[in-house]
Amino acid sequence: MTTIVSVRRKGQVVVGGDGQVSLGNTVMKGNARKVRRLYNGKVLAGFAGGTADAFTLFELFERKLEMHQGHLLKSAVELAKDWRTDRALRKLEAMLIVADEKESLIITGIGDVVQPEEDQILAIGSGGNYALSAARALVENTELSAHEIVEKSLRIAGDICVFTNTNFTIEELPN
């Protein structure tokens, strides 16, 4: 699988992910870009799960963003509705973290939209719990930037989770 983590701190939101693509217990690729900018660079999105499924969801989510003039929550809820009701979409196995300058969300593989706890930290994927724990400890006990926290959290997850590597893609808003 993978690890995707998002941290919002001091006016910045950062989403980062590793680059490993696995098929069963075999590493197929080590430098996949699982974090991307959508909607003219105003929205960050990262995926965990099946790569082809995630690209389908990226496309669908970007269409929803266009349809709803970039309104993140409305677009996420509309995608989740489609995900639940469309037979083909229901078979997709992926999760997304999406974020803009105002809010961050997880869109789950069963069509739920989840807002973060008060700490504004989100993580998904096989190494998600490791990255989430590390990010929470770093936010609470350091003055590191959101970018530094995401990078350190991914590194910790990559050291523990065999389905996460240390080849990261990290995007942030504002630039």
Curated annotation (Swiss-Prot):
Principal location: cytoplasm
Pfam families: Proteasome
Protein's UniProt keywords contain Metal-binding: yes
Enzyme Commission number(s) from the entry: 3.4.25.2
Catalytic activity of the protein: ATP-dependent cleavage of peptide bonds with broad specificity
Class of enzymatic activity (EC top level): hydrolase
Residues reported to bind Na(+): G158, C161, T164
Active site: residue positions: T2
GO cellular component terms listed in the entry, alphabetical order: HslUV protease complex; proteasome core complex
UniProt keyword Hydrolase present: yes
CDD domains recorded: protease_HslV (cd01913)
Cellular localisation: Cytoplasm
Cited SUPFAM superfamilies: N-terminal nucleophile aminohydrolases (Ntn hydrolases)
GO biological process entries: proteolysis involved in protein catabolic process
Record key words, sorted: Allosteric enzyme, Cytoplasm, Hydrolase, Metal-binding, Protease, Sodium, Threonine protease
GO MF annotation list: metal ion binding; threonine-type endopeptidase activity
Regulation: Allosterically activated by HslU binding.
Record function comment: Protease subunit of a proteasome-like degradation complex believed to be a general protein degrading machinery.
Family: Belongs to the peptidase T1B family. HslV subfamily.
Assembly description: A double ring-shaped homohexamer of HslV is capped on each side by a ring-shaped HslU homohexamer. The assembly of the HslU/HslV complex is dependent on binding of ATP.
Name the UniProt record assigns to this protein: ATP-dependent protease subunit HslV
Annotated source species: Haemophilus influenzae (strain PittEE)
This protein's encoding gene: hslV
